[in-house]
A protein has these predicted regions:
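Active-site-proximal, structured, solvent-exposed surfaces of multi-pass membrane proteins
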Residues: 602, 625, 663-793
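Membrane-interface helix-loop junctions at the exits of transmembrane helices
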Residues: 47-57, 103, 136-144, 173-194, ...
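Periplasmic/ER-lumenal interhelical loops and adjacent helix-loop junctions
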Residues: 2, 66-103, 107-109, 278-371, ...
């Protein structure tokens, strides 16, 4: 087995060259050149951090947990230390696969039949349909997608942070140390495999662009910053983009040239932001359309702050209950134990709690900057780093102020620690410049170093942390004698600190457990049938949602914070399936409910520990024990004509679904139907002429004798309702209603023999128009504007 997978490495080098060209162009657009040292170190960072995975013997995927999640996998020894990263297997990779399937079919991923009863990957930011880095990583097989994507994130984040530090006047060595601290620290590695870090990698670039706009605004800088803004907004995590925008605004305001005038810089930044939003509008507008009705919005808008007693003498009481420990994250690599190795003793989980750690070198530099550097340019970074900690820890005076505005309850404020870690690294560069200078260090600098070490060791005084501080102190002493050697010594301390620490966040998955296709899965997929018409599911927690989509089976169960709340209420009433933001996983129960027939579920995964069903039939003959394969004998196709139609109010949906006895008897909402009532009676089901995700053409048979021939009928479907669905027949649009409170229904007039259903993400057309206008304006800026004036550089730095 070779030490390095040559094919993987060559492909990675080619894709990184393309991304490097983009970074070079962005830097030129901002009036800078990327130094050779920044380019070389930006390439070395992913190679150093990811070498164990480049051989291809282990996957950068936590797939070992599938040993118990997929029936029929041969037993082997695996580690479950990375099971907290289960969203990678149940959300991120299934969404990515659906995007790849759509692109392979030469269609845009507007809709997926397999995911969550039907959903739109386009409107889901974390699917990363238009994420620049995810698009580049699609050159790799799906099992290496996360590895390639992380390498690209490291490249972009490193060079962007170097550029930001240089724009603040930092020296070459301290800028490289700041870039290494951010790209190898918790700001990137705590959530290394998630879309959130694809967004945060662009934050230093945005901050650099905004600083340039406040200092020397020009057309090319505006266009370049707009492109960076669009890349950030398209990268899969809107709340991180919002926090990154706040950080960039703080940088621009704090580092502006007073002679340039606030109004001019603010105006240029506003124009760049508007153009960036316009470029990203084809994705942003559909996302904003679905957010208000999502599970995430409903759960977070109702959350409250803790009511524990407050005491001035007890600092943990200054924060919301359970959040105070977030303030410790920058202080030690082992503030909550060794990541994924020791028992966890921090807030919530490893990824959330460790986000704020940027290394002891950055911490020491930040304390030196705080106490000994009299440079106003350091203030925005120091202030933002502190504020990000207070937001993540829910400092009660600040939290109560935010909670007065309901929409401000929605963001996960722990994500603010990512730009906070970036701020800490750049602030640390100010202190490192002083430590690496030939000037005599003031006493305040030594006090800053001592204070940083004391606080860090008060949090965790293990042998490794003590050794790191001893080496850091020795590096500072070397820097007093030979600054260049001191810089190299600090780099060695940083790598010794962060490389093993960052690698501890990365799973080493067994390739044989990457979505294994077992005989049970093969039999299940055959029984479930065509995903355009039929579905499968797992009883209780079996074959958890989105897992089946990887094997080509449509599943009605959502596992997505953007799932429509109305759909989840229907599933709760029928099956007790009620995932929330606090209770993330939920079982499916009561599989004898008629809604299972309505949803077109043909195959169900069961086990000997699941309560027996009265309606489902075991068809496996016991050959998959302890698992069972169950058949539903009476599923309805995805579209049908109901036997009877009830009219109910919107507030009666859950009660009606809970009392449902016949899948062919459906309900429509009185608020939508008004006085209209469809003709009833049996009718043959429509025949699909085309059944592509998001586009269905049905041949409508003549109404049966008892179906009220000549009257309007209701075409019922089990497609999850969304604003983007439309219907046409005979050259005219048809009204689309909700059936059973959460599914698409069509008011079908008498006469048409064909009906067409199509999904277009709501806001997509308007977004495309906005993108076209913004793109034209950006091109005009690039063609008409002069090259950005280069920022002044100091010799010898």
């Amino acid at each position: 087995m070779p030490w390095i997978d040559g094919r993987l490495l060559v492909t990675l080098a080619g894709v990184m060259l393309l991304v490097q060209a983009v970074c070079w162009l962005l830097a030129r657009g901002l009036g800078w050149k990327l130094a050779r040292s920044a380019v070389i170190c930006g390439w070395l960072a992913p190679l150093i951090a990811l070498t164990p995975w480049l051989a291809g013997r282990e996957l950068l995927v936590p797939c070992d947990m599938l040993l118990t999640a997929v029936p029929g996998v041969p037993r082997t020894e695996v580690s479950h230390q990375y099971d907290v990263l289960n969203d990678i297997l149940y959300q991120i990779l299934p969404w990515e696969l659906e995007v790849r399937h759509a692109l392979a079919d030469r269609r845009l991923p507007f809709w997926s039949d397999r995911l969550e009863g039907g959903s739109s990957p386009w409107a889901n930011p974390q699917a990363g349909v238009l994420s620049p880095l995810q698009m580049a990583a699609r050159a790799f097989p799906i099992q290496h997608h996360l590895l390639a994507l992380l390498a690209l994130k490291l490249l972009v984040a490193f060079q962007g942070t170097w550029l930001l530090a240089r724009l603040t006047g930092r020296g070459r060595a301290s800028s490289l140390l700041a870039a290494a601290g951010f790209s190898l620290g918790g700001g990137l590695f705590s959530w290394a495999l998630f879309p959130v870090t694809a967004a945060v990698a662009w934050v230093p670039w945005l901050a650099a662009g905004v600083i340039r706009l406040f200092r020397r605004p020009g057309p090319r800088v505006i266009a370049t910053t707009a492109a960076i803004t669009a890349a950030l907004l398209l990268s899969g995590h809107p709340e991180t983009a919002a926090f990154g925008g706040l950080f960039a605004a703080a940088c621009g305001l704090g580092l502006r040239r007073r002679a340039a005038g606030l109004r001019r810089g603010f105006g240029a930044a506003a124009v760049a932001a508007l153009l960036g939003f316009g470029l990203a509008a084809p994705h942003l507008l559909p996302f904003l359309e679905i957010v208000p009705d999502s599970q995430r919005a409903g759960d977070t808008l109702t959350q409250t702050l803790g009511s524990q007693p407050w005491s001035l003498l007890f600092p943990p009481s200054w924060f919301d209950y359970g959040f105070a420990a977030f303030v410790l994250s920058p202080l030690s690599p082992h503030a909550y134990g060794r990541p994924y190795q020791d028992p966890f003793r921090g807030p919530f989980n490893w990824p959330d709690s460790e986000t704020g750690y940027a290394g002891l070198v950055a911490l020491a530099g930040a304390f030196v900057a705080l106490l000994a550097v009299r440079d106003r340019r350091a203030r925005p970074f120091l202030i933002f780093a502190v504020v990000s900690l207070l937001l993540a820890a829910r400092f009660l005076p600040l939290a109560h102020l935010l909670w007065r505005v309901p929409p401000l309850r929605v963001p996960a404020y722990s994500r603010c620690l990512m730009p906070g870690a970036l701020a800490l690294c750049v602030a640390g560069a100010f202190g490192l410049d002083l430590l690496l200078s030939k000037r005599r260090l003031p006493v305040r600098a030594w006090i800053g170093l001592a204070l940083a070490a004391a606080l860090s060791l008060a949090v965790a005084a293990d042998a490794w942390t003590l050794a790191l501080w001893a080496l850091l102190a020795a590096a500072v002493l070397v820097a007093r004698w030979r600054p260049r050697w001191g810089g190299l010594a600090l780099a060695a301390v940083l790598l010794a600190d962060l490389v093993p620490w960052s690698r501890s966040f990365l799973p080493r998955g067994n390739p044989a457990l990457f979505y294994p296709r077992t005989p049970y899965i093969e039999a299940f997929a055959r029984e479930a049938g065509d995903p355009a018409v039929w579905r499968g599911a797992g009883a209780h927690y079996l074959l958890y949602p989105n897992l089946l989509s990887v094997y080509g089976v449509a599943d009605f169960r959502p596992h997505n914070p953007l799932a429509p709340a109305r759909y989840l209420r229907v599933l709760t009433a029928a099956f007790g399936f009620h995932p929330t933001m606090t209770s993330y996983f939920s079982p499916v129960q009561n599989l004898d409910h008629p809604l299972l027939d309505f949803l077109g579920v043909r195959a169900v995964a069961g086990s000997l520990s699941v309560p027996p069903s009265l309606t489902l039939q075991a068809i496996d003959g016991g050959r998959f024990a302890p698992f069972t394969l169950l058949r539903n004998p009476d599923p309805l196709p995805r579209w049908f004509f109901p036997r009877a139609v009830d009219t109910i109010g919107a507030g009666e949906v859950e009660r009606w679904v809970a009392g449902m006895t016949d899948a062919r008897r459906v309900a429509i909402l009185r608020e939508e139907a008004g006085s209209w009532r469809p003709a009833g009676g049996e009718s043959p089901p429509p025949r699909p002429l085309l059944a592509s995700p998001g586009h269905v053409v049905l041949k409508i048979p003549s109404a049966g004798a008892g179906a009220g021939a000549g009257g309007e009928r209701l075409l019922a479907t089990s497609i999850v309702w969304s604003k983007g669905w439309s219907a046409r027949a005979g050259g005219r649009s048809l009204p689309v209603l909700k059936t059973d409170g959460a599914f698409v229904g069509v008011r079908l007039p008498a006469g048409p023999s064909r009906v067409e259903l199509r999904f277009l993400p709501p806001g997509f057309v308007l977004g495309c128009a906005a993108a076209a206008v913004s793109l034209a304006l950006c091109v005009l800026c690039l063609l008409s504007g002069r090259a950005a004036a280069p920022a002044p550089r100091r010799r010898g730095r």
